[in-house]
Amino acid sequence: MEKTKRLIVRRDAIGFIKSILESYEDIGVLSVIDGDKGLIEIIYSAFFEEDLIAILKDMKNNGIDYMEVNDG
């Protein structure tokens, strides 16, 4: 099953986050929804949800902060 997470991140961190996710093949696909606001969307398989959450937590622990946003 496909799932999504929307996050607001610093604009200058978008490329770094994308490269981290790409280095973990099949974890998720990052799309920029609004680059000016730093709004990104990650589409991922429910199978990899725990892995994705662990990667995001590790990034936050290393200074790449984000805020998860809900649709609507």
Question: Where are the predicted features?
Answer:
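Short, highly charged low-complexity linear segments
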Residues: 2, 38-40, 64-66
